[in-house]
């Protein structure tokens, strides 16, 4: 019970999409295009968890399905986004109840963990979330690319757009996987997921190119052009030579754009592609937070069964997790 009413947590009905859109608009600074993209391509009422008080939706969140590769094992998980409460109903504890319900729910569905990208990590630490990954940003003058050359042998740079994108999904996934196979954890991308990434980039008016050398997909880049800056959302290659060759494409914009900002997965160490590391500003920021729901599943995944480790866990929210694990 709360504010004299009856509270209920449930998944949304088909007819409640407009409510979801209004909550999003009231709570986040996304542009109309970004909101339209999300609700046209990603939103699913079956994953939209709402809290009702007196039959009125007062708080909500979205649980989007993802497959995580965690220590070489594919794990079904949920990426939590759009956690928000009615503007007039904030600070009444609705969001806490909703988040706790989501955690209990996900545990019942045998998920070892859920994850999110926080606007404010302090809020989510109260619920047992903690950072587990970083993202790297590299800022440099476009002139730093002056020595990056195009390939010498048979090659082509192909621009990917809405009409042809399906033709390149398999090759994009190959380049992505070759970069991820040595990582401890990463999001798995299938055709459906990669198609969504390309759709979002196209909706954000970004450009996408893939580099073929001797008919083999060797690198791809997703970037946007803004005033004096080029922002590279994602750039991956089979090796450092192909990485330089895809960045050589960016140098073609030097007459119009002065600076480049490049986002990259943790431990990319891209500064070593350049001749002078001191000219490259590298910023490492915490990226995603994770909440463990099933400690035993995680210990199994970490292959800790045979090691002589004893761990005591106190979980104030999922109390059944509290105990000594050995």
Annotate each language-model stretch with its function.
Residues 89-101, 111, 241-245:
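Conserved acetyl-CoA pyrophosphate-binding loop and the N-cap/start of the following alpha-helix
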Residues 2-60, 64-65, 72-79, 146-191, ...:
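Short amphipathic alpha-helix that is part of the acyltransferase structural core
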Residues 68, 117, 130-147:
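Conserved catalytic-core motifs of GNAT/GCN5-like acyltransferases
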Residues 2-3, 18, 154-326:
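Intrinsically disordered, low-complexity, positively biased terminal segments
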Residues 108-112, 118-136, 267-283:
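Conserved active-site alpha-helix within GNAT-family acetyltransferase domains
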Residues 83-85, 235:
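Hydrophobic adenine-recognition pocket in adenosine-nucleotide-binding enzymes
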